[in-house]
């Protein structure tokens, strides 16, 4: 990040630029080091120096004097090419980045950072990959996962489609963990694939000793070479590095803010465990799409506006009315218990369905399924053309309704799509063993 005008003026008075060695003097303090680029979101009055010790320090320029000691050049890293060991005997895998980098190269002596996402960067950080696959890597875009939108999902899906068409035997998506489960479920509905599509990420950055990035990436490579041709999420299965779980993309959810094993399969077990470079199916009775079972196809038609609304005590019916007034294409309700909402909002929900806005009911309990026949409030919703979607996750219902409403304007047809199990997102059987209580 460039320095603001105020700081630029402070530096230019002494003809100082990034890379120069400088001395900064304040009352009772003196520091000497190389001027670095300013990080994002740092204090507006702060300059950054790289000290001889290797540490970086931020200095507030208030009451400071600065002197150029020697002229330098902007830090950069000279990188040697990497031997990718391309072989016809290995599968071709495409690793696509949606935000940041899987492997940034940092020169701790100069402070320079090489953030470009290329196959060479990836293989420098994880050279073991060349023993397992021919790696092609590229950045699709560079955003924080909380800034993900349906338009980015479309671009990701189209890039995946092109990579498979160009000969990729498997796809790995590097993605921020916060909204990874939304993206996984959205891709599940937009793509039929003959090869595995695996999303992975890290809870701890790759420069930390406790990082999960390497283990997750290596496990994802094995998943992308496997026979499981679905959209999946591959992340740590435990807090240590013993194994990773492979979750169905429409059934996974981030369940902890910081644990490395944050992702959990809801209302089913993970499809597989990946341990010591081996992919083991957890339950042979669970059906999954196998490699080359489906022809490659892409359908990125999504509705423009679908809302996901959580029910809570005291919710105002105006919240529903706003989406109706703005002609939303659909509403997903995250209801209480078996799929309930307060009497106060039923009139507004009825207004939505009467104006041909499909309304779908899920449960904020996550585990278990909706059943709107048990209590009177649920039956009233059923009578007013609200449908329950069983054990489907709220986030999955949101992405599925976006896709369903993008296929047709007919509410009955949208409801039929929502009630049909397309990508393993819902099931008529449910084991109590899937409930996590510890």
UniProtKB/Swiss-Prot annotation:
CDD domains: GatD. Gene3D superfamilies: 2.30.30.520, 3.40.50.40, L-asparaginase, N-terminal domain. GO terms for molecular function: asparaginase activity; ATP binding; glutaminyl-tRNA synthase (glutamine-hydrolyzing) activity. Keywords: ATP-binding, Ligase, Nucleotide-binding, Protein biosynthesis. GO terms for biological process: amino acid metabolic process; regulation of translational fidelity; translation. Residues 91-421 form the Asparaginase/glutaminase domain. It is an enzyme of class 6 (ligase). Disulfide bonds: none annotated. Its EC number is 6.3.5.-. It catalyses: L-glutamyl-tRNA(Gln) + L-glutamine + ATP + H2O = L-glutaminyl-tRNA(Gln) + L-glutamate + ADP + phosphate + H(+). It holds the Pfam family Asparaginase. The active site is at 101, 177, 178, 254. InterPro entries: AsnA_fam, Asp/glu_Ase-like_sf, Asparaginase/glutaminase-like, Asparaginase/glutaminase_AS2, Asparaginase_C, GatD, GatD_N, GatD_N_sf. Coiled coil: none annotated. The keyword Nucleotide-binding applies. The keyword Protein biosynthesis applies. Allows the formation of correctly charged Gln-tRNA(Gln) through the transamidation of misacylated Glu-tRNA(Gln) in organisms which lack glutaminyl-tRNA synthetase. The reaction takes place in the presence of glutamine and ATP through an activated gamma-phospho-Glu-tRNA(Gln). The GatDE system is specific for glutamate and does not act on aspartate. NCBIfam families: asnASE_I, gatD_arch, PRK04183.1. Belongs to the asparaginase 1 family. GatD subfamily. Heterodimer of GatD and GatE. This is Glutamyl-tRNA(Gln) amidotransferase subunit D. It comes from Methanosphaera stadtmanae (strain ATCC 43021 / DSM 3091 / JCM 11832 / MCB-3). The gene is gatD.
């Amino acid at each position: 990040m460039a320095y603001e005008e105020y700081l630029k003026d402070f530096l230019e008075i002494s003809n100082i630029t990034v890379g120069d060695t400088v001395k900064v003097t304040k009352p009772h303090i003196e520091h000497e080091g190389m001027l670095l680029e300013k990080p994002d979101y740092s204090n507006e009055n702060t300059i950054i120096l790289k000290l001889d010790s290797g540490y970086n320090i931020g200095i507030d320029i208030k009451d400071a004097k600065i002197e150029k000691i020697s002229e330098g050049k902007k830090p950069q890293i000279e990188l040697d090419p990497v031997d990718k060991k391309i072989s016809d005997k290995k599968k071709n895998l495409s690793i696509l980045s949606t935000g940041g980098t899987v492997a940034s190269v940092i020169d701790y002596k100069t402070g320079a950072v090489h953030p470009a996402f290329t196959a060479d960067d990836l293989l420098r950080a994880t050279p073991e990959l060349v023993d397992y696959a021919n790696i092609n890597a590229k950045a699709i875009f560079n955003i924080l996962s909380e800034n993900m939108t349906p338009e980015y999902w479309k671009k990701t899906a189209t890039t995946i489609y092109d990579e498979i068409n160009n000969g990729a035997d498997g796809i790995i998506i590097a993605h921020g963990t916060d909204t990874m489960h939304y993206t996984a479920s959205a891709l599940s509905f937009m793509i039929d694939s003959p090869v595995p599509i695996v999303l992975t990420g890290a809870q701890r950055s790759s420069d930390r000793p406790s990082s999960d990035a390497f283990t997750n990436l290596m496990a994802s490579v094995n998943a992308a070479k496997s026979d499981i041709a679905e959209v999946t999420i591959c992340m740590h299965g435990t807090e240590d590095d013993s194994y990773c779980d492979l979750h169905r993309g429409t059934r996974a959810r981030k369940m902890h803010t910081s644990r490395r094993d944050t992702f959990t399969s809801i209302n089913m077990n993970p499809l597989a465990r990946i341990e010591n470079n081996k992919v083991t199916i957890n339950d042979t009775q669970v059906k999954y799409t196998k490699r080359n079972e489906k022809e490659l196809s892409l359908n990125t038609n999504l509705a423009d506006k679908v809302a996901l609304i959580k029910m809570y005590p005291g919710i105002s019916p105006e919240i529903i009315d706003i989406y109706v007034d703005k002609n939303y294409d659909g509403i997903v309700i995250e209801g209480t218990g078996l799929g309930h909402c307060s009497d106060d909002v039923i009139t507004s929900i009825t207004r939505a369905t009467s104006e041909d806005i499909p309304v779908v009911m899920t449960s904020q309990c996550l585990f278990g399924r909706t059943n709107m026949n048990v209590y009177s409030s649920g039956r009233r919703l059923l009578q007013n053309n609200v449908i329950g979607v069983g054990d489907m996750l709220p986030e999955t219902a949101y992405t599925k309704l976006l896709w369903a409403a993008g296929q047709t304007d007919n509410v009955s047809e949208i409801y039929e799509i929502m009630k049909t199990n397309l990508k393993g997102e819902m099931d008529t059987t449910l084991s109590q063993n899937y409930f996590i209580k510890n």
